[in-house]
């Protein structure tokens, strides 16, 4: 695996986790929003969907070629790919919170107010997980930098 390919993989992980943190912060920010821009109900929690990106020389692709009877190229450098965000989806499964507040302008005829389905504990857990995954990618990048630097020192 080339160093540049490794940097691309780490970069894709950093980008994906940054987007995950952005979505968590949007959820926390809108945790009390009772009406979205189009005026249709309260804000719904959003979630990020990730997908592993398999390169042309990834382990999965090599196994598929071997199963098809192709002779694997032993000298080929693996191209693992990384990770990408496929979509940001709204949480349709978690019910909205209903609170009795007849004085609120967005309350229904019975006086109930629909609040977002954002659970602050879940959001904090997601933020911590994304932050740790981001930090792991930074550590991997720093390790790669150290390896490259050591290689350059040996070459002198």
Region roles according to the model:
Residues 1-156:
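Amphipathic alpha-helical polymerization modules
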């Amino acid at each position: 695996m080339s160093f540049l390919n490794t940097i691309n993989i780490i970069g894709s992980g950093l980008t994906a986790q940054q987007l995950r943190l952005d979505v968590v912060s949007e959820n926390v920010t809108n945790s009390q929003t009772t009406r979205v821009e189009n005026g249709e109900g309260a804000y719904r929690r959003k979630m990020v969907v990730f997908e592993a990106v398999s390169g042309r020389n990834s382990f999965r692709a090599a196994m598929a070629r071997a199963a098809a009877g192709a002779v694997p190229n032993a000298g080929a450098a693996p191209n693992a790919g990384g990770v990408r965000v496929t979509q940001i989806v709204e949480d349709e499964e978690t019910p909205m919170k209903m609170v009795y507040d007849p004085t609120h302008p967005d309350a229904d005829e019975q006086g109930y107010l629909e609040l977002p389905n954002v659970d602050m504990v879940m959001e904090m857990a997601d933020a911590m997980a994304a932050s740790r995954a981001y930090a792991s990618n930074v550590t991997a990048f720093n390790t790669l930098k150290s390896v490259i630097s050591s290689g350059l020192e040996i070459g002198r």
